Design a protein with these regions (language model features):
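A short, conserved, highly charged catalytic patch centered on acidic carboxylates
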Residues: 3-118, 125-151
Length: 151
């Protein structure tokens, strides 16, 4: 196997190799992407959201842009509710990147723009789910991410 097993269910990805470069088919964007460790995590987490947590594919945005302190940044994944409001930001890291305070702070900075109620950080091995209360300026970590209808 090209990349290590993750702490997510295995999925039957469409992998290809062309000129020594591996690619993975992105089911949402309908195109082949260069297979990097971070992309491996992102594609697993997308499938986890769709198949396990019942998030509609049409309500997931991949690599959405945002402006933060006059700098153009990208969120890995954004989930929307059925009314088109952002409800979750997911920051994906390669399995070799430890989920640290710095990684969580990066996602929190992105959330200062989006103001979502769920903040998720994952490296495919460890997943941190935080429910944000913007009114109280606080958050609470959850062991498990609720199904889409309960977000």
């Amino acid at each position: 196997m090209l990349f290590r097993s993750l702490n997510l269910p295995p999925y039957p990805f469409r992998l290809t190799k062309k000129e020594e470069q591996h690619y993975i088919f992105d089911e949402i964007r309908k195109k082949h992407l260069v297979l990097t460790p971070e992309e491996w995590v992102r594609q697993h987490f997308i499938q986890y959201l769709v198949l396990e947590k019942k998030v509609p594919k049409s309500l997931i945005q991949i690599e959405g842009g945002l402006l933060l302190n006059s700098l153009q940044k990208r969120t890995d994944l954004v989930v929307y509710n059925r009314q088109g409001k952002r409800i979750m930001i997911i920051e994906c890291k390669a399995p070799s990147i430890k989920i640290s305070q710095g990684v969580f702070d990066q996602a929190a900075r992105y959330n200062s723009v989006h103001q979502v109620k769920w903040l998720v950080v994952t490296n495919g091995l460890q997943h941190c789910y935080a429910l944000i209360s913007h009114q109280e300026s606080s958050f609470k970590f959850w062991e498990e991410l609720p199904d889409y209808e309960n977000l």
